[in-house]
Amino acid sequence: MMKRTLLLMVMTLSALTGFAQSEQKTWSYGSHTYTQQGTLTAKQYDKRAKGVVTFTNIPSDYEEFEALYTQFLGKTPHGTAAMMVMAMEIYGRDREVGKQCIELINYPSNVNSVISRLKDKFGTSAYAPENDSYSQRYLPAAVLKGATPQNGYRPQQPYTVEMKASVNKHQELQISGSGRVVYLYVMGKGWDTEQRTVEVLRQPNQPLYKIFNCPALYTQCKTIQGTWQGLK
């Protein structure tokens, strides 16, 4: 009995290690509130590292998005990965503003592939029609906690993006300059494979991370059941 109790204690401590020595930080812009917590970093690889970002709203414009990136979320790999979800949603609302947001947080070589794919997937309508299996305007919601195809991709609030370390260790960039690529999983119920790989780059002497590659965030997800109600 004692052995079982000790084993359960070890398992619990192991599960909590991903957030060890990590405090939740909060940042506000007007009435919008953002938080982040996690131990994911480019400094060293930790297979138990995790990250979580919450937000009450999608940034209203480029100015808010830029401030959020430069002052808060862009300073961590998980914060930057979560901002890719926001940028995708902004692109769905306004192509030009969304393009600016995508260019801001992405490494240059990744920009065109993201925009090309989103333009194709989002089509011209503001919201996806019922049971649309291709023009998936709801893609940004597919990685938000609580959102599933069955509930019309309606996430819990505040919106939450959960992440954890990939099985792939950090890699030094050998082409297109220098830096270290952090591989992480963004969790989402929109696919059979719920671990969506995102590559985030940290370059020397640069305070902010950049999205290096992220096709798993905009590949075909499960078809919505019902009509998507959008995000606020």
Model regions: which residues?
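N-terminal secretory signal peptides that target proteins for export/translocation
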Residues: M1-M2
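Sec-dependent N-terminal signal peptides
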Residues: T5-S14
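Short, flexible beta-strand-to-coil junctions
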Residues: L13, M86-R93, M187-W191
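Sec/Tat signal peptide C-region and signal peptidase I cleavage site
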Residues: L16-A20
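Cleaved targeting-peptide boundary
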Residues: Q21-Y29
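Core segments of small alpha/beta cavity-forming domains
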Residues: T35-V143
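Surface-exposed, charged secondary-structure patches
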Residues: S116-K189
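Short beta-strand edge/turn micro-motifs at domain boundaries
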Residues: Y183-Y185, G190-L231
